[in-house]
Amino acid sequence: MLITRIIKREKSSKYDVFIDGEYAFTCDAETFFMLGIEEGKEITSEQYKYYVNYIEAKEAKNHAFRLLSRKMLTEKQLADKLKLKGFSEEAIGEAVSKAKEYDYVNDENYAKFFVEEKMQSLYSRRRIYYELLKRGVEKEIIEKVLESIYPHEKEVEVIRQIVEKKKNSHREIQKLKKYLYTNGFEIENIEKALNLT
């Protein structure tokens, strides 16, 4: 395999590389010089695969860091977004590992932030639990974070806040019980909160 042509893009630090007369890949200037790519250079198919895998892994990492600079994500959410972008499993694995290494992705920190935020929005423990499960956070992490930040006693307080907003009559109380139960609050906590108000 022969690198037959290299075109530097205008107004960009990217290079288009052609092998045996056909377009092969695009890379940035840093990668271009680091890999020692030059016109007329003979490369093996193993070198070609290495170049392509290296470039894809670097692009996946860069994309992951851009995503994480805008929004906190779980490992699963990050991997899913990279998969949607078309990156290979290997490149996704490298990107997620690098993000974890720099502590840009940390499911426990994500869970703590999520629980704090949703508690303020008067979510039940159960609803938060299932929302975090959907986002790929492990059960053990969710349980640990819920116990430390949102114990059952706090859920009773949250129920009281909801009750204060909605209670007027017996009929309203019954509707409220049903509302609270369908939103994931435990029946024992509902009864406690209603008896204490």
From Swiss-Prot:
It comes from Caldanaerobacter subterraneus subsp. tengcongensis (strain DSM 15242 / JCM 11007 / NBRC 100824 / MB4) (Thermoanaerobacter tengcongensis). It holds the Pfam family RecX_HTH2. Keywords: Cytoplasm. Its main location: cytoplasm. It is found in: Cytoplasm. Belongs to the RecX family. GO terms for cellular component: cytoplasm. It comes from the Bacteria. PANTHER family: REGULATORY PROTEIN RECX FAMILY PROTEIN. Disulfide bonds: none annotated. Transmembrane segments: none annotated. GO terms for biological process: regulation of DNA repair. Modulates RecA activity. This is Regulatory protein RecX.
